[in-house]
Amino acid sequence: MQIDYNTALSDGLELFRQSKWHKNYNVEDIYRYLIAPIKYNRIRLYYQYGKPIGLVTWCWMSKESGQKFLNNDYYITENDYVSDTKKELWGIELIAPYGNVRQVVNLTKKEYAAVYGRDEKIHWHRLHEP
């Protein structure tokens, strides 16, 4: 599924502003965690009654990079969003500021299966309080 860049950027920024975890991201963070995923079609936005209620971004990483990321020793780069041939699928951002987390996660699993043709394990890195 191809996304509209301007809509994704506008709706993504709105969700970032509504999230206590994301509202203080700087320009570099916005590029890394929103614009780059939009550029490489590694984002899905979810809507209810025409209003954005959630988004997910992802990339593929090697096992080594994934472990470093998990240990906070690796920062996602734009290149991480390019390839889908690396070993591990990583969910990078999950934003559901209106309490629709379970709905967004379930839709994401279905989306990944449709896009990649397999039921892929999604690795997540849970952050601590902002």
How does the language model describe each region?
Residues 29-35, 41-44, 74-81:
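Short secondary-structure capping micro-motifs at structural edges
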Residues 12-15, 34-38:
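Generic hydrophobic, helix-prone segments enriched in Leu/Val/Ile
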Residues 1-29:
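Short amphipathic alpha-helix that is part of the acyltransferase structural core
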